[in-house]
C-alpha cells in the first residue's frame, strides 16, 4: 500500500486536485490514473496519498485484478465541499448563492 511519509505542510491546491478528481470520478480510481490526472510525480503523489489516508479523506482498496484503487470517504466528500466553498468565498470573492 502506501509507505511514504506524509508532507508536514501540504499544498492545499494539490489536495484540492486530488479530492476533485476523485469526486468527479464518482467511484474508485486506479492509483496511477489518479496520479497522472493530478499532474504530480509519483513520489509527491505517494506523500499526499499517505497524508490523505492518515486524515481519513480517502481509502485504498486492493482489487482482485492486483491493482489498488483510491476512493473518497464520506469525510473526504465533505472536505471537498468545504474546500470548494472556501475557495469560492475567500480566493474568488464569491459569497454562497451568487
Regions inferred by a protein language model and the residue ranges of each:
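Amphipathic alpha-helical dimerization/coiled-coil segments
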Residues: 1-3, 82-98
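A short, conserved structural fragment
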Residues: 53-63
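Short acidic, hydrophobic short linear motifs in intrinsically disordered regions
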Residues: 27-37
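Basic, amphipathic "hinge/linker" alpha-helix immediately C-terminal to the N-terminal HTH DNA-binding motif
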Residues: 66-80
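Short amphipathic alpha-helical interaction segments
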Residues: 9, 39-54
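Short helix-capping/hinge SLiMs at alpha-helix to coil transitions
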Residues: 22-26
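Short alpha-helical segments that sit at the start of domains
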Residues: 1-19
Amino acid at each position: 500500500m502506501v509507505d511514504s511519509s506524509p508532507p508536514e505542510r501540504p499544498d492545499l491546491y494539490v489536495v484540492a486536485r486530488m479530492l476533485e478528481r476523485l469526486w468527479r470520478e464518482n467511484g474508485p480510481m486506479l492509483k496511477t490514473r489518479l496520479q497522472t490526472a493530478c499532474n504530480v510525480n509519483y513520489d509527491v503523489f505517494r506523500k499526499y496519498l499517505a497524508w490523505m489516508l492518515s486524515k481519513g479523506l480517502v481509502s485504498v482498496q486492493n482489487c482482485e485484478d492486483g491493482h489498488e484503487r483510491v476512493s473518497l470517504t464520506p469525510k473526504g466528500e465533505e472536505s471537498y465541499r468545504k474546500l470548494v466553498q472556501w475557495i469560492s468565498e475567500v480566493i474568488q470573492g464569491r459569497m454562497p448563492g451568487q
